[in-house]
Regions:
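Active-site-proximal cap/loop segments of hydrolase catalytic domains
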Residues: 1-222
C-alpha cells in the first residue's frame, strides 16, 4: 500500500461488441474477491484509469455505485462521435481503433448502433452518482479533447459531482514534470477527501477561474 491505499489491477476479458460491459463484468467480481480478503473496505473504494482505462472508469460509474470516488484521464466517452474523429498524434482516423483494436466492435456504428450506444458512457450519464475527477488536456492527440468536454458538460447539466482538470498545451499524458507532480497531488487530495474524509482543498470546493489558472498553478508549484 501507499498513502494507506491498497491497489487492485484486474485483468479484463473482453467480449466482442461490449468493451464497456466487459470491464464491468470483470472488475466487479475482482472487487468482490478483494473485499473478501479483508484488506479492502467496501465502503471506501476508489476507481482510476487513463486513456482506455479512463474510458472504462467513465463507463463503470454509469453502471455501478460501488465506488465512492473515481478519477478518469483522457477518457473516450462517446464511441459514436469518436469513431469519425482523427487520431492527431499519427494523423490517421479512429475507425481501426474501434473495429480492429481496443474497441472490438464488429463493424462501424451505422451497422452496429446498439453496441456503440450501449458501451458509450455519455448515453448513460444520468446514472452517475460517483464523484469524478477528470483530466483531459486541450492538445490531446489521441483522445480528442471534445470527448472529455461532452462528458463534463453532460454531467454538469445533470448536476452530477464532477471536476475537470486541464493542463494547457499538454497532449494525451503529462509531459512536463511540474504538471505530473501537480496532478499527482490533486488526485491524492481528491481521494483523501472522498475515501478518508479529509477536508477538501479550496480548488475542489470553489474551482479555479480560467483567467486565474496560471497564478493558481504557480502558487501550487512543487
Amino acid at each position: 500500500t501507499s498513502n494507506g491505499f491498497a491497489v487492485l489491477m484486474p485483468d479484463i476479458v473482453y467480449k466482442m461488441d461490449d468493451p464497456g460491459m466487459s470491464a464491468l463484468w470483470a472488475v466487479l467480481p475482482a472487487v468482490d474477491a478483494a473485499v473478501k480478503t479483508g484488506v479492502v473496505d467496501a465502503n471506501k473504494m476508489g476507481l482510476h484509469g487513463h486513456s482506455w482505462g479512463g474510458y472504462q472508469t467513465s463507463f463503470l460509474i454509469t453502471q455501478t455505485n460501488r465506488f465512492k470516488a473515481a478519477a478518469a484521464g483522457a477518457p473516450l466517452t462517446n464511441m459514436i462521435s469518436m469513431y469519425d474523429l482523427i487520431y492527431w498524434n499519427s494523423g490517421g482516423g479512429n475507425m481501426s481503433i474501434f473495429e480492429a483494436s481496443q474497441g472490438r466492435f464488429l463493424g462501424g456504428p451505422w451497422e452496429n448502433w446498439d453496441a456503440y450506444e450501449r458501451n458509450s458512457p455519455i448515453y448513460h450519464v444520468k446514472n452517475v452518482q460517483t464523484p469524478l475527477l477528470m483530466l483531459h488536456n486541450d492538445k490531446d492527440g489521441a483522445v480528442d479533447f471534445t470527448q472529455g468536454i461532452e462528458y463534463y458538460n453532460a454531467l454538469r447539466r445533470l448536476k452530477k459531482p464532477v471536476i475537470l482538470v486541464q493542463y494547457l498545451g499538454e497532449n494525451h499524458g503529462l509531459g512536463k514534470l511540474e504538471n505530473r507532480k501537480d496532478y499527482a497531488v490533486r488526485m491524492l487530495e481528491f481521494f483523501n477527501h472522498h475515501l478518508k474524509g479529509m477536508a477538501a482543498p479550496v480548488w475542489m470546493e470553489k474551482g479555479v477561474p480560467r483567467l486565474k489558472l496560471g497564478d493558481h498553478l504557480n502558487e501550487r508549484a512543487f
